[in-house]
Amino acid sequence: MRRVSWSTVLIVVVMVSLFFVEHVVVPAAAGRVLTEKSGDGSATMTVEKMKSTVDSWFQRLASGPSPRGRGH
């Protein structure tokens, strides 16, 4: 009978562990579940503030062609 090397055993153990973690431990529906709309509208205000912040970041970006020269 042939002897099995430790590296082969290690690879099989890692693959079985990954399969177990992927299919048994982790099956979550979503990473973050959004809550229902609350009566005070705080979630809507947060989304609007986030949108305005991202818009202001995009406005700060330089527009036009890239500068020519070394490193570009």
Swiss-Prot record:
One of its GO terms (cellular component) is apoplast. The keyword Methyltransferase does not apply. Endogenous secreted peptide that acts as elicitor of immune response and positive regulator of defense response. Amplifies the immune response triggered by flg22, the active epitope of bacterial flagellin. Acts as a negative regulator of root growth. Induction: Induced by infection with the bacterial pathogen Pseudomonas syringae pv tomato strain DC3000 and the fungal pathogen Fusarium oxysporum conglutinans strain 699. Induced by the flagellin flg22, chitin elicitor and salicylate. The modification 4-hydroxyproline is found at P65, P67. It is found in: Secreted, Extracellular space, Apoplast. This is PAMP-induced secreted peptide 1. PANTHER family: PAMP-INDUCED SECRETED PEPTIDE 1 (PTHR37245:SF4). Its main location: secreted. It comes from Arabidopsis thaliana (Mouse-ear cress). Expressed in guard cells, hydathodes, leaf trichomes, and vascular tissues of leaves and roots. Contains 4-hydroxyproline; hydroxylated on Pro-65 and Pro-67. It comes from the Eukaryota. One of its GO terms (biological process) is innate immune response. Keywords: Apoplast, Hydroxylation, Plant defense, Secreted, Signal. Residues 1-30 form the signal peptide. InterPro entries: PIP1 (IPR040273). Coiled coil: none annotated.
